[in-house]
Amino acid sequence: MALFFKCNPIDLDNEQVTDYLHHLKSRHSTPSDSFFKHTVYGLRYACKVCGIKELEVVLPSIERPKKLPVVLSREEIQLLLKTPKLLKHRVMLGLLYGCGLRCGEVRNLQLKDLDFDRKMLHIRQGKGRKDRYVPLGDMLIRGLKKYLDAERPITWCFNGNDKEGKAVALSPRGVQWVVKQARQRSGIKKEVTTHVLRHTYATHLLEMGLDIMTLKDLLGHVDIQTTLVYLHVSRLDKQQAFSPLDRLYTK
């Protein structure tokens, strides 16, 4: 593989490994699942021996089961948003749900990205290196203004601290901790992660009447197929399912 890419083995990244496996698949007519499994096992062992971070590889010949995203109800969202004691954490949760942001997008959010006059949020170079704008609701704007007046951040909206106590962008673990703590204290039984809040944002917008193409742009998806999964979990009027037993004895 290193010879194929003409580089040092320890410099290989996930994308190169996946590309190489797809290359092997295209060369061989019927590669077995076990062939790719053992290829990946070998890669993982090599990573362990070399002391480098284990590569995350998608096996091209093995179809993963397609799971529908977890979606919270509106009542669960209301409960989650009012649970944190700190305003900073409530605002962070509000952005994850109210703007459909990814974890990294919340971390990298800067003061210059907030446009309160136009009620827009500028997401710079998110996943896929593509900027986008998402609407900022009045409730979020009020919360952000109150938080900014109290905390006075300089660059990033949400600061963390390095070992010397200097302000840096909040770590991924810091964002995830806020979500985890809110879930535990709220008593919600469903899985709640930053991405579950993003799924919930998308699903609720569809249920409120937003069209699928606009949702695609708000989420920053390149392929519409990625967005279409939310149609399967949305309770749209024309798609609301019911049990025939409920109507068997009704006139």
What positions do the PLM features span?
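Conserved catalytic core of the tyrosine transesterase superfamily
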Residues: 1-251
